[in-house]
Amino acid sequence: MHNRWHLYNELIDSVPSTELVKSFVYGDHWLMVESDAGGVGIAQHFPAMPGAQDPALSQYEIMGQPLRKVAERLKSWDFNQASIGLAALNAANNTLALRPESPIQPGVNRLPGNAFDFFRAEATGKKVAVIGHFPGLRMLRQHCDMCILERNPQPGDLPDAAAEYVLPEQDIVFVTGTTFINKTITRLLELTRTAKVFMVGPSTPMHPLLFRHGFASLSGLVVENAAGVARALKNNDCEAIFANGGLKVNLLPGGAQ
């Protein structure tokens, strides 16, 4: 029987066993984990589930803990704990300064402006699905046949249950790192085997092993100034993440193209 956790286990195993959690920052929409090796990762989080622990209190549990052990929370069904796990995973991988020898180094392109604009030429004239309703899709939508799948649909969106029917017909599919948190990523990859799958957003794990699982591109965040990004998260200013030390990056198979 296929192990549904295989991709998760591979990512968690990629986290160095020697690194520890140095700091934890919790905002209204995003959280941040910093390792004692200098790596920083962020992830989106969600309203606490009924009866679940307040995720803001997790700092008292994870400070000084092995980064890999905290990354194991990515498999939790408490989605806020899973967000903490994803941020820990990203702290190990989404960094240029910490691992200059990493495959991430030659594969990174700086992405000015809207990340979706980077894919405009690729998407022109194609059937495109986006998992989740995001700002900045207006320009891209003018160049392709786009459908948006959303758990809480806005006018013109499709409900997320439509994925089983529409994703196998798409040329390009955009997903975010939150699909790791809510455990939909495994099924989404099964439904998109004939499409190009791009993972986008600050929660994206920038690890090349994802290319073996069907991803064509990874667009995420590298934190160059931990203090600046921490201030933005505490002030609940998502746009300020990118103005205060968050660098948009893109990783392609085999390096920059």
Task: Go through each PLM region and give its residues.
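Conserved mixed alpha/beta catalytic, RNA-binding, or beta-rich assembly cores of soluble enzyme
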Residues: 84-87, 93-94, 127-166, 176
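Active-site glycine-rich loop that binds ribose-phosphate moieties when present
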Residues: 109-117, 152-162, 180-181
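Short, conserved loop/helix-junction motifs that constitute active-site signature segments
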Residues: 123, 140-141, 165-168, 189-194
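Conserved acidic residues
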Residues: 126, 171, 216
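C-terminal functional extensions of proteins
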Residues: 197-257
